[in-house]
Amino acid sequence: MLQQSAAVDVIAAGKAAGVMLNAFAMSTDIPLRRMLGIGPSRPAALPDGAEWAEGGHPLPTEGSVAAARRALEMAQASGADDLLVVLLSGGGSALMAFPASGVTLADKQQTARTLMEQSADIHELNTVRKHLSTIKGGQLAIAARGTVLTLAVSDVVGDDLSVIASGPTVADDSTYMDALAILNARGGEAAFPRAVVERLRRGTAGEVPETPASGDVRLQRAIARVIGPQRGAITGAEVAARSLGYHVHVVREPVTGEARESAVAHVRRVASEAGTLPRPFCVISSGETTVTVRGRGRGGRNQEFTLAMAGVLAELGENVAAASIGTDGIDGPTDAAGAIVDSTTLQRAHDARLAADDFLKDNNTYAFFERLDDLIKTGPTATNVGDLQVILAG
């Protein structure tokens, strides 16, 4: 495909954009005409001649809009015999954002913030995003005249290409009606900007074109593959745990749902099976939970998941530790990837006069773990394959 193309352009968008762009450029001897990377921060090194655009995350910024405009310009400039390679990774939805006509950046920011605070999952969030965008939901691909090849690293449970980075180069079978229903289920229309509600209503009435759906002829030259599945982190964790002498049990079902509720259910499920697991054991799982924000504190879904685990960890006995982290190194609006708890956490909290339940109710898990020095801080990892949970028992 590369050899048969008149010219090759590359767009990389997401938290792994720098790594993916560098790796792709190094993997081919074919000259790359134009290269654009879109990420949260400029990497230390880029291929010669590559452009870099910095966007915002978890909410889009003016930089995100400028980046999306540049990506759309590159797609529109490609010829019928050219190849556009699109390298996608988690975070691409916010990092590359081009509001649809009548919708402002502020409208999109408020909408995304409200949906996240109302515990919308990534499928719901990105369904709405796609219907407020000029680039998401296959629209980047139909702007290109030539072939579009998408290679994606997934942060989405199930590796749905239409959800990863809001699927800018693949068919979108969600509708304006779906998006409007999500708003009504997550706070009601009054909780969202008027321009957003009006656009979704107009789309539902057929006054605004839908995103290109499966079978759309405009996508017949668009090819997409997942090259890094969401469960990829489990493989690395399993190898590491075995090398340390643990008997490893991998949970096949993804961990999803409200963080604090899923955490309790997860620990109790492990506890019910603990008698059949040889010790020391390591239970590994992955997925992506959500948080309904009711308090005024600071934290993220992994910190909330971890603190909720602490309350029931005793059911696994002594000498137990558990952690949940975001593989991108960023959990919510904090500088931590997640946190760790063990059999001593609640006693240490009590000794420090910290009421775990109060911190959980206020969504203030960062402050709780900071006081106990139990935050996990990796810094940005330049990738994103969802969240990883580990339970260790000696």
Which residues does each predicted region cover?
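Glycine-rich oxoanion-binding loops at beta->alpha junctions
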Residues: 38-80, 123-124, 128-129
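Accessory alpha-helical/coil subdomains and C-terminal extensions
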Residues: 144, 149, 171-265, 269-272
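Internal helix-turn-beta structural module
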Residues: 306-394
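A glycine/threonine-rich phosphate-anchoring loop and its flanking beta-alpha core
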Residues: 122-188, 200-201
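Active-site segments that bind and position negatively charged phosphate/pyrophosphate groups
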Residues: 231-235, 239-324
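An N-terminal, well-structured beta->alpha segment
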Residues: 1-11, 19-23, 27
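A glycine- and small-aliphatic-rich helix-loop capping segment at beta-alpha/alpha-beta transitions
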Residues: 23-31, 50-52, 76, 99-110, ...
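Gly/Ser/Thr-rich active-site loops/lids in small-molecule metabolic enzymes
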Residues: 103-120, 172-187, 295-322
